[in-house]
UniProtKB/Swiss-Prot annotation:
Domain YcgL, first and last residues per copy: 3-87
The organism of origin for this protein: Pseudomonas fluorescens (strain SBW25)
Signal peptide (UniProt feature, chain positions): none
Protein name: YcgL domain-containing protein PFLU_1517
Superkingdom field: Bacteria
Pfam families registered for this protein in UniProt: YcgL (PF05166)
Length: 97
């Protein structure tokens, strides 16, 4: 199953993306979700197939959501996924005694 998909970036929340079928655009996305998502900025289009790898999403889930509800919402990564925490000794290295 091959789907041509448009991906929109949220202006409200960094790292939040909305996948929709290109032919439907944003028509099938519920209004409350669009309000929470904020202004949708078209990022790019891509062809999705079951064999395609996505960096942060399971392709099977994305395709299933597109078929069942007409969209897939990608949430931003949890803070721990993108912020490296430094060891305590490095944080205190330049502290005055």
């Amino acid at each position: 199953m091959k789907r041509i998909c448009s991906i929109y970036r949220s202006k409200k929340k960094d790292g939040m993306y909305l996948y929709v079928l290109k032919s439907d655009a944003l028509e099938r996305v519920p209004e409350p979700l669009m309000e929470a998502f904020g202004k949708a900025h078209h990022a790019f289009d891509m062809v999705l197939t079951p064999e395609r790898k996505l960096s942060r999403e399971d392709i099977a889930v994305v395709l299933e959501n597109l078929d069942k509800q007409g969209y897939h919402l990608q949430m931003p990564p949890a803070e721990d996924e993108y912020i490296e925490h430094l060891p305590e000794e490095l944080l205190r290295r330049n502290d005055p005694m």
